[in-house]
Amino acid sequence: MSRLAAGLALGALLSTTAMAQQEPTFHVDVPLVNVFVSVTDKAGAPIGGLTKDDFQLFENDKAQTIAVFERDTSAPLAIVLALDLSGSVYKDFAAEQQAAQHFAKDVLRPQDRADVVAFADGTREVTGFTGEAKRIASGLSGLHPGTGGTAFYSSISLSSGLLRPEHGRRVLVMISDGDNTVNGVSYEDALDEAVRDEVMIYSIIDVPVAASAGRDLAGEHAMITLAEQTGGRAYYADQASLDQVFHRIADDLRTQYLLGYYPRKRAPEEQGGFRSIAVKMSNAQNNAKYSVRNRPGYYASAAR
């Protein structure tokens, strides 16, 4: 074979190989899914110092690769403080105001924002989102309890809507006995809105009396399940323990972990809809010692 023929043959081979290697690849942009995770011991104290290797993350029971990891995450906080002004919580209201003011002063960093919502027969936004703890304190000071009913679920709907455009961690801190006496928004609707808007609910359950008689146990149960189903937490409180409860919420928010992942490729029939999220400890011993909390999932079209 002549040098020219050999050269042409080699060139054709290289060209064919290059074409095979350069076959078009189609990429689909998959949004990063952020999951904020709280880890506590059996006494409820936050656990810090864990690493990415300490966690396993699953979407719809399928293991995912953790692409982003932060401990004591600096992700901004957007917090709504929702206070019940109805007659059922009248006796503890002054202590609730003061404890909420201390909380805002304690927890807000330069990158954080807070808002105040008040509810009784109706619901209303009080301050608008602000990074100034003094403005939050002023808004809280201007609230006065009444004698009307409680639009509890409507307040969750309003708060979720206010938090929807905010970036970072969306947190709703509710102070109430959970006694919903105003028709309009149902429990299911309120929970669905909070999950869709990725709102973590921290429920502070006002205990009017120690005995079960005279208490709205169904309302208390609703406040507990709303917290559990959104990755938050529920606390019982009276006048003496309000400051301590707010302090525990602040500690919980300060020590959260951020786990981010790009969901693995899904079959066409799996596109869209609700995607469950589970976070576990990699070590079986840690799984037995610690409790892990995170939002239960997200709607695929709204991943953030």
What are these regions (language model features)?
Residues 1-2:
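N-terminal secretory signal peptides that target proteins for export/translocation
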Residues 5-17:
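Bacterial N-terminal signal peptides
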Residues 19-304:
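Scaffold/interface architecture of coatomer-like assemblies
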